[in-house]
Amino acid sequence: MNREDVFNFSAGPSVLPTEVLQTAAAELLNYHGSGLSVMEMSHRSREFMDIFAATKAKLKKALSVPDTHEILFLQGGASLQFSMIPLNLTAEGDTVDYAVTGNFANIAAKEAEKYCRVHIAASSEAAGFDRIPAQEELSLSPEAKYFYYCANNTIFGTAWKYVPETGGVPIVCDMSSEILSHPVDVSKFGIVYAGAQKNMAPAGLTVVIIDRALAGHERAVTPLMMSYQRMIDKDSMYNTPPCYNIYMLGLVLDWLEKQGGVAGMEKRKSAKAKLLYDYLDESALFHGCAERASRSDMNVTFRTGDAGTDAEFVKFSLERGLRNLKGHRVAGGMRASLYNAMPEEGVLRLVETMKEFEAKHHV
């Protein structure tokens, strides 16, 4: 199959805009007449420093990042933040609040327990992580050093539709699977972070946006590469950053601006998700897994109710160019990730394929 015949519904690493890949391919051997690939450039070279500064400025503009916050381009994946956050924001004996609404928030809370007292402010685990708690369900600790939540749960297909009110306690949010898909008031957050491999760039880059007031209080035992203050002081270049991924993020941000920015993405994501959810709600074979009020626009989870039929559908879809629809091993079923670069045509093809499969099963 050719690229135009395939739609990639992977939860991450995920689909990138074809236009971005074409630009990267054209510049691969000779970036802007430098005679070098970006892959070969010194991170201290003028060429790369210009790429770095431009990408940072584009992200600041795209998310309207206030001057109180610093943008960091880090390594280690979003999972490294599970440790980095408590090491930098707490002292031994401090209390923190965690909302456990999915697998990754659960892992983050367990990791934080190594460093401080974790209070579970909310959990949907008993319900199979199929819903997001309402504000009035949150049990908040007034002495908490921060409140942590994961905005979009890729595995279970749920998303927070609101920013929690915490009474002034700094909010830390994992936005890995929804960043750049809608406007965000960054000023409400102490830390926003995201692994880039879902909506931003290839795997290998982690973006952290931090209120500078929260930095500089890390524990003495904090590894030097895990100090927010050190990375702020060195402008993310204490060591060699993931240079090519930063360049790719810049290209994605150029593409994003042409699509109307995050406001344009919000309209697109809602329209794409509606196409799929509308079909799921009328289907006699397939059904959605998440509670309607908590449904994610980025990751749509669904199943038939029979594991064998689910597997048959995944194979049926693959033969028609629809890739990576198998659900996460923790949840099973199917999952369609509708990130920014997924065109509406891909969702329409998926719905058509689901209808064809359903008709064959005479339901």
Model-identified regions with their sequence ranges:
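PLP-dependent enzyme catalytic core of the Aspartate aminotransferase-like
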Residues: 1, 6, 319, 332-363
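Active-site phosphate-binding strand-loop segment of PLP-dependent enzymes
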Residues: 112, 124-179
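Conserved active-site segment immediately N-terminal to the catalytic lysine
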Residues: 172, 186-197
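Conserved PLP-binding catalytic core of the aspartate aminotransferase-like
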Residues: 286-316
